[in-house]
Swiss-Prot record:
Record's function text: Together with its co-chaperonin GroES, plays an essential role in assisting protein folding. The GroEL-GroES system forms a nano-cage that allows encapsulation of the non-native substrate proteins and provides a physical environment optimized to promote and accelerate protein folding.
Stored Gene3D superfamilies: GroEL, GroEL-like equatorial domain, TCP-1-like chaperonin intermediate domain
UniProt keywords, alphabetically: ATP-binding, Chaperone, Cytoplasm, Isomerase, Nucleotide-binding
HAMAP family in the record: CH60
One Gene Ontology term from the biological process aspect of the record: protein refolding
EC number of this enzyme: 5.6.1.7
Family according to the record: Belongs to the chaperonin (HSP60) family.
Name of the protein this chain belongs to: Chaperonin GroEL
Quaternary structure, from the entry: Forms a cylinder of 14 subunits composed of two heptameric rings stacked back-to-back. Interacts with the co-chaperonin GroES.
Length: 547
């Protein structure tokens, strides 16, 4: 078993705090509209330049094992805030540093750590409730744009792009961020349902200049099995040919004789047909086929429920205004499905999202909601160099998460004002069960000024003066670090998503509480120290032998 190094009490806490400060000091320089960049060296390629707090935190590993434990615990705060709200990582880190340093000072003065922690927890719970009370819904496109702009470090073009994307695909739509090819940002919107399966044979192509298959007002047959025998599909083909409409076949697979016959019929112009594989695998494929069925008012032909492909009729086929198939994707535009049924299906999938514990499953279910409810928007980030593109892509990603959080739980005044206001209101009435809990409450409420102070410091102004002026104000009154003016934060468009502020505070207080109540730290001895320890033990054994 490895030899361990153990530290107790104040020795352990001092080391831990040093690690916390190193990580937090590196992260907090990025906070606010005048926050600075951090350059991260990479093992290969150009360095990365970022203003994203969690990207900075993830890079930090310290040589001293005890200091590193402190740093890693604060890194967890940033990661958690990023996972839940997608933004607010720097705010969470600043709050954690402030609560930990104030808390450890109180512990060093002889206070009981457990009572301090209980006081901190009470203060945080009360402030979270107050944040919910002052939160207002984020509904207009202008508010969405403002949230996106603030989160992208005051880049208005990013805020506008995200607001446009949400307007086009709806608040439930999928918005993805990709590398662009030019200098300017671009927004591509895919309307209708798109899935990543292309045509099964290039002979189906009827628009050779674009290399695509386009079907106008087609029938759509959905089959939950492989089709290899043409006799199974023949009755449907004949019925569709009589109706004079094209046909799209979506099945687990179409192969052999069946595919060859479809290709021959298409090339001879007897019937206009195209075949694609069904999206997904296993149970997810069944669910997605059902989604397409509801969107196009069709029925999934499945042997599991006693249906036979040979007996399928035109009534069981779905329909859409248009279908476009490329080598890699199929897009169904304007399915004729019933609006009420589509909404009911969306509600059902949303319930599955709430019940799911897997991030991957949640993401896939969210994609299904978007395909049914709105569409897919792709923001293509443009920049002059790859380094600049990476930095901008990080900011767009943060802004996108922030706007989603704002739509979900509403918005509060930004610039650290919401926490100051909530803490002020709570301080008048909140008391603990004993004096040490009261100290915990006070230090937590004092720590909630830290994000405002850091934003002001990063803009080169006097943090104490600004913090006092903001505390003396009321409502949305705060400090705009961009223009260096005081005013109404909501009117100036400085907004934070409630979810981001709430998550940052809760995660920071949770980890800080654990660190304040730490009395002992254990780590492996570094290799050189291990060798010295083993040599010393060996030397003592030799001396015993001589005697």
């Amino acid at each position: 078993m490895a030899i361990k190094d153990v530290k107790f009490g104040n020795d352990a806490r001092v080391k831990m705090l040093k690690g916390v400060n190193i990580l937090a000091d590196a992260v907090k320089v990025t906070l606010g509209p005048k926050g600075r960049n951090v350059v991260l060296d990479k093992a290969y390629g150009a360095p990365t330049i970022t203003k994203d707090g969690v990207s900075v935190a993830r890079e930090i590993e310290l040589e001293d094992k005890f200091e590193n434990m402190g740093a890693q615990m604060v890194k967890e705060v940033a990661s958690k805030a990023n996972d839940v709200a997608g933004d607010g990582t720097t705010t969470a880190t600043v709050l954690a540093q402030s609560i930990v340093s104030e808390g450890l000072r109180a512990v060093a003065a002889g206070m009981n750590p457990m009572d301090l922690k209980r006081g901190i927890d009470k203060a945080v719970a009360a402030v979270v409730e107050e944040l919910k009370a002052i939160s207002k819904p984020c509904e207009t496109s202008k508010e969405i744009e403002q949230v996106g702009t603030i989160s992208a470090n005051s880049d208005e073009t990013v805020g506008k792009l995200i607001a446009q994307a949400m307007e086009k695909v709806g608040k439930e739509g999928v918005i993805t961020v990709e590398d662009g090819t030019g200098l300017d940002d671009a927004l591509d919107v895919v309307e209708g349902m798109q899935f990543d399966r292309g045509y099964l044979s290039p002979y189906f192509i009827n628009k050779p200049e674009a290399g695509t298959v386009e079907l106008d007002n087609p029938y759509i047959i959905l089959v939950d099995k492989k089709i290899s025998n043409i006799r199974e599909i023949l009755p449907v083909l004949e019925a569709v040919a009589k109706a004079g409409k094209p046909l799209l076949i979506i099945a687990e697979d179409v192969e052999g004789e069946a595919l060859a016959t479809l290709v021959v019929n298409t090339m001879r112009g007897i019937v206009k047909v195209a075949a694609v594989k069904a999206p997904g695998f296993g149970d997810r494929r069944k669910a997605m086929l059902q989604d397409i069925a509801i969107l196009t008012a069709g029925t999934v032909i499945s042997e599991e429920i006693g249906m036979e492909l040979e007996k399928a009729t035109l009534e069981e086929l779905g329909q859409a205004k248009r279908v476009v198939i490329t080598k890699d994707n199929t897009t169904i535009i304007d399915g004729i499905g019933d609006e009420a049924q589509i909404k009911a299906r969306v509600v059902q999938i949303r319930q599955q999202i709430e019940d799911s514990t897997s991030d991957y499953d949640k993401e896939k279910l969210q994609e299904r909601v978007a395909k049914l409810a709105g569409g897919v928007a792709v923001i293509k980030v443009g920049a002059a160099t790859e380094v600049a593109m990476k930095e901008k892509k990080d900011r767009v990603d943060d802004a996108l998460h922030a706007t989603r959080a704002a739509v979900e739980e509403g918005i509060v005044p930004g610039g650290g004002v919401a926490l100051v206001r909530a803490a002020n209101k709570v301080s008048a009435t909140l008391t603990g069960d004993n004096e040490e809990q009261n100290v915990g409450i006070k230090l937590a409420l004092r720590a909630m000024e830290a994000p405002l102070r850091q934003i002001v410091e990063n803009s080169g102004e006097d943090a104490s003066v600004v913090a006092r002026d903001v505390k003396d104000g009321s409502g949305n009154f705060g400090y705009n670090a961009t223009t260096e003016e005081y005013g109404d934060m909501l009117e100036m468009g400085i907004l934070d998503p409630t979810k981001v502020t709430r998550s940052a505070l809760q995660f920071a207080a949770s980890i800080a509480g654990l660190m304040i109540t730490t009395e002992c730290m254990i780590t492996d001895l570094p290799k050189e120290d291990k060798l010295d320890a083993q040599a010393a033990m060996g030397g003592m054994g030799g001396m015993g032998g001589m005697m």
